Swiss-Prot record:
Name of the featured protein: 3-keto-L-gulonate-6-phosphate decarboxylase UlaD
UniProt subunit comment: Homodimer.
Pathway: Cofactor degradation; L-ascorbate degradation; D-xylulose 5-phosphate from L-ascorbate: step 2/4
UniProt entry keywords in alphabetical sequence: Carbohydrate metabolism, Decarboxylase, Lyase, Magnesium, Metal-binding
Cofactor(s) needed by this chain: Mg(2+)
Family per similarity comment: Belongs to the HPS/KGPDC family. KGPDC subfamily.
Length: 216
């Protein structure tokens, strides 16, 4: 089982605040996510600028595409994104369109499982050639005190068994990682737990050490 990668979510409102994070921890993570908030605040230039600064890193545009899959994904890939996200409620043809464009750029598409989705949809994504999903505990669920539970673990295992590469996100803390031991997680996303730490560098390194211990 390969080691899960570590992704930092830049859910900043401005490039200046995003740079404050990347200057510290870009070399400690595998994937730099241009979060939805930053995509809206700064547009695709955020993707272009971060990829120019860190060409050796995977840069994800978390656009959460809901429609116009080909147009929006092309905008992201032409800005040199490696991956883009499509929201789970999007029509299957939106996901297919985004994937077609991704292939032109040797990129990839992730289905963001935020909100309601079904296992029937999941099978449609697999049948369409989608390989990646993001299992998401929403900000609102976190704020309501909803913790990771057995239902989450069961769903993640089932997605993995279907052949998906699963990314896990949603207020992920260091102490949550052992919950997922034994599951071939593709990526763990940490946002505030790294960005807002007293030492973001040490926080990122702690995540990497824990991942190596649990999956190594």
């Amino acid at each position: 089982m390969s080691l899960p990668m570590l992704q930092v979510a830049l859910d900043n409102q401005t490039m200046d605040s995003a740079y404050e994070t990347t200057r510290l921890i870009a070399e400690e993570v595998d994937i730099i996510e241009v979060g939805t908030i930053l995509c809206v605040g700064e547009g695709v230039r955020a993707v272009r600028d971060l990829k120019a600064l860190y060409p050796h890193k995977i840069v994800l545009a978390d656009a959460k595409i809901a429609d116009a899959g080909k147009i929006l994904s092309r905008m992201c890939f032409e800005a040199n994104a490696d991956w883009v996200t499509v929201i789970c409620c999007a029509d299957i043809n939106t996901a297919k369109g985004a994937l077609d464009v991704a292939k032109e750029f040797n990129g990839d598409v992730q289905i963001e499982l935020t909100g309601y989705w079904t296992w029937e949809q999941a099978q449609q994504w697999r049948d369409a050639g989608i390989q990646q999903v993001v299992y998401h505990r929403s900000c609102d669920a976190q704020a309501a005190g909803v913790a990771w539970g057995e239902a989450d673990i069961t769903a993640i295992k089932r997605l993995s068994d279907m052949g998906f590469k699963v990314t896990v996100t949603g207020g992920l803390a260091l102490e949550d990682l052992p919950l997922f031991k034994g599951i071939p997680i593709h990526v763990f996303i940490a946002g505030r737990s790294i960005r807002d730490a007293e030492s973001p560098v040490e926080a990122a390194r702690q995540f990497k050490r824990s991942i190596a211990q649990l999956w190594g």
